[in-house]
């Protein structure tokens, strides 16, 4: 994927590129949901409302591009595909915002799941919590050997998986 010229989406939390009929969407955020400016092998690629907005925009962009036949979704770096929602973001917002945030995440992942183009999730590291829910919205999931853990750890806290 080094031949790709990524373009940052508006909030700079998702990068987008196309090559030979494939749209590549890369999640790129730190533990607080802030944008990454370079490859960070330890970044958890957490998501916030801004990241979900960028992901939604990228999905729509790929869907309406007649030259794109397939979408590949991956994470920045090699430690995490995505660790799910930013805990610091969730701790700092109102219950009403959390409700609408989860609703928007549901709508975004439904759009990803229902897009008529083939969606492949390239799991390049841990895919946990909402990160796994993003991966589950793809048609095909493939992980590199020893990529990391896959799971929904929030169930140990009595919380249901809520965005996928």
Which residues does each PLM region occupy?
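Conserved CoA-thioester-binding segment of acyl-CoA-metabolizing enzymes
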Residues: 1-74, 110
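Structured loop/turn residues at beta-strand edges in well-structured enzyme cores
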Residues: 20, 66-68, 85, 114, ...
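Glycine- (often His-adjacent) and acidic-residue-rich active-site loop
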Residues: 29-42, 46, 75-108, 158
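An acidic, glycine-rich surface segment that forms the CoA-thioester-binding/catalytic face
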Residues: 49-64, 87-124
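Hydrophobic/aromatic residues within transmembrane alpha-helices
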Residues: 55, 73, 86, 134-135
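CoA-thioester-processing core
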Residues: 108, 112-114, 122, 128-164
């Amino acid at each position: 994927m080094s031949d790709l010229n990524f373009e940052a989406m508006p909030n700079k939390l998702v990068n987008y590129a196309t090559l030979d009929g494939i749209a590549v969407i890369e999640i790129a955020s730190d533990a607080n949901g802030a944008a990454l400016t370079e490859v960070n092998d330890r970044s958890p690629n957490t998501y916030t409302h801004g990241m979900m907005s960028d992901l939604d925009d990228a999905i729509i962009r790929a869907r309406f591009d007649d030259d794109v036949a397939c979408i590949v979704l991956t994470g920045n770096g090699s430690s995490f595909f995505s660790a799910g929602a930013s805990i610091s973001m969730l701790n700092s917002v109102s219950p009403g915002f959390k409700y609408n945030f989860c609703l928007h995440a549901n709508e975004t992942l439904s759009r990803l799941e229902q897009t008529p183009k083939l969606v492949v999730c390239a799991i390049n590291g841990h895919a946990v919590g909402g990160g796994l829910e993003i991966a589950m919205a793809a048609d095909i999931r493939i992980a590199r050997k020893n990529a990391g853990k896959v799971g929904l750890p929030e169930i140990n806290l009595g919380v249901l998986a809520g965005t996928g």
